[in-house]
Amino acid sequence: VLEHLKTIYLRTLDACAPELLVRAAITRDMPRDVVAIGKCAGALRDGLDDVDDALVVVPEGYRMAVKRSRIAIGGHPDITAGSFEAGRKLRDFVDARDEILFLISGGGSACVELPLAPWFDERDLIETNARLVASGLNIGDINCVRKHLSAIKGGRLAARVKRSVTLVYSDVSTGALADVASGPTLADITTKADAIAILERIGGCDQIIAKLRDDECPETIKRIDDSRFALIADNHTLVAKAAEIAAEIGLMPVVVEQQIESEIGDAARELLDRAGRLREGEVLIAGGEPTLVRRGDGKGGRCIELAVRMALAEGERRSDKRRSDSLVRLPVDSQRKPSDWRVRPTSIAPKIHALLGTSDGVDGNSGVAAIALTLAASIDREVAERELLRSNSLAVAEEIGETIMIPPAGNNLRDLYLLACT
């Protein structure tokens, strides 16, 4: 079963390659000067042929463009000095042109940046971004704040040119295209008041809040003239392709239509509950990005920690079932002693098999792309819970499952979850 799940996962990544999907979205009337931003920037650029000039802005360690391009390399998930250097190159490239085709993918929020001067400086952005990433906030709230501190997010980049077309390869919630890379080329509906409220919730950002309250500090861009945008692909594309491939290899796909975006413990229980209702030959296919709070300096990621939490929940469920099934008192006279109770064989619970994988090939700081495991495997609860407290889920995952490593895939459509029962 796990081999089938691996096949679905790897074939799905190949089928959703950005260079394949972007070609289908290109029309002849689009600008021939190109800016590609994010984890998929190199692959998106390579999907285009008829280009006059191109700037590719990509996080360090991700796929570069093969075709002729200018290159700028920034940081991820942390904003680095390279991110600001990439921001300056981007600003200069855009300011020298009237019309630009923007290819936007996730990861752009950190890998390219410029502070909104004079209100914010580079240190403000680095420190605030680090606090946001560690906060457990959803990506929409994180990017709301990022937009209001940046000179190139929240529509401000597209506002620098006369005409723009934006194609989005989305790693965010369905329909939230302005959150991809913090929406550098799309009009923004959030306000400074929204950003302030978010910062007040996480605390420790009084100086940033004070600067945002300055009446001279501008709002993000609410309207962009002569600008249009379209979606290339998102998590639903990934899930739909996985379902198609599952059917091709003889399995019955059971698709979860809504993305999994809850707290990671809740996400583990939801997936486990859904998987427990599967029949043999069916495969549950879901996608999304649960929220995860970074608690320490260990190694792990969303998919790895989700696997550990599912294993813990399954172990608890099986333990409860054994206790409830193990003894039955016979319905006879009340004089019988507990020693007269009879043991009833425990019913055999189905084994749940899972593959939980990233689409970009990088799960947090774990160095792996995905994990495949059978949830009936034993897990040391005390050790697992201790390691989770310091975000060191990888150490536990390697004991209960098979970690899968692939080169950075060039994709970035959130995560893919595949589960089956035997």
Sequence positions of predicted segments:
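Accessory alpha-helical/coil subdomains and C-terminal extensions
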Residues: 161, 187-267
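Intrinsic disorder/low-complexity segments
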Residues: 315-350
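Glycine-rich oxoanion-binding loops at beta->alpha junctions
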Residues: 59-96, 145-146
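Internal helix-turn-beta structural module
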Residues: 308-315, 350-422
